[in-house]
């Protein structure tokens, strides 16, 4: 399999995964919006309409954030792979590594490879921080699940 064929297969699988996740999220959102106005019969005696609508609004907010997160993570994966981000990170880390440990060259060892993985994981975690902050301090706080503040 050539590099081009592998890239096409990767993009096809990524597009399939993105489409399915988006479809499921939108289906879930559509179902929640459609049934927001009435409590299901099985719960009619235990949950008030107001509580049911509040739960539906919370679910809508969480789905909206999840869709945004899915879009950003998909773009991040495309940037790392097809966009050459991983090669750029590897090159930059190689320069830093060669400066810090000149005696360890001519070939990257296991410690360099592990550090490359850790850098990519750290950058991905930094990408997750705004979503986590928004989830806890905006969405959860708006619905009364989080009473913490930044102060």
Question: What kind of region is each of these model predictions?
Answer:
Residues 1-151:
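Hydrophobic or amphipathic, alpha-helical segments that drive membrane association/targeting
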């Amino acid at each position: 399999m050539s590099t081009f064929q592998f890239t096409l297969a990767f993009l096809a699988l990524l597009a399939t995964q993105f489409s399915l996740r988006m479809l499921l999220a939108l289906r879930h959102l559509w179902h929640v919006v459609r049934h927001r106005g009435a409590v299901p019969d099985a719960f009619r005696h235990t949950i008030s309409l107001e509580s049911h609508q509040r739960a539906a609004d919370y679910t809508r907010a969480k789905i909206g954030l999840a869709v945004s997160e899915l879009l950003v993570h998909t773009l991040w994966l495309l940037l790392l792979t097809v966009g050459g981000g991983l090669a750029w990170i590897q090159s930059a880390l190689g320069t830093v590594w060669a400066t810090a440990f000149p005696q360890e060259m001519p070939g990257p060892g296991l410690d360099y490879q592990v550090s490359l993985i850790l850098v990519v994981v750290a950058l991905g975690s930094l990408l997750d921080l705004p979503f986590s902050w928004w989830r806890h301090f905006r969405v959860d706080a708006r619905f009364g699940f989080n009473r913490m503040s930044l102060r």
